[in-house]
Amino acid sequence: MTYNIHVGVGMDKKLDLPRIAKVINDQKPDLVGLQEVDRGVERTQHIDEIAELAKLTKMDYAFAFNLPYQGGQYGVAILSRFRILATDHRHYKNLREAERRGFIRAEVLAHGQKLNFVTTHLDYQYEDGRVFETEQLLKALENVAGPLIVVGDFNDVPTGGAYRLMRGSFADAWSMSNPNSEGLSYPADKPTKRIDYIFTRSADGLRARRGWIPETPASDHVPVVAELEIRF
């Protein structure tokens, strides 16, 4: 599952983390990549959002901050039904003065086997920035062993350069399971864009059995969920 939670603020402009947690719990995911997560930030009442969501979902978690903001941290996070064994966080270099972004990778123990799960959030303004970030992401992951899943808000449509780069070595779980559906995820009240993705490394042989997009106004994005079959 991938979900840009908009720091817990829904389309009604209300901060409501229990609502976000309910959306997650209703899908019963094993792994969740979250983007736009606050930790101790003034605008979200200094709440440690990922710790709170972990408590409400009863999942393990990992957080990586991309920016210091209003006395706290803002970044990406992972929730896992499986035990997290190790994490890795990288910041991307920028082509120009822009918001610092990055990714977090968690190695988890799934049914006795190691699995790597990554979430990222790319530049929303410039396509060349997204492409540059994606190049760095792929380079950082090229030697990761075992099944690899990459999810996130790529801020890129399927005709964009970042998406095309990912498809060079990764399969698109939504396209595999829903070839006749657009998979629109933003904005939440009336989605017109597909920018949130679940990718599986092609060489690993992961198969998307099904994918779905819950309708919810809990954030400005809707989540994207896939059921994956992994042959260890």
Describe these PLM feature segments:
Residues 28-30, 58-60, 113-115, 145-148, ...:
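Loop/turn elements at helix/coil->beta-strand transitions in domains of secreted/extracellular proteins
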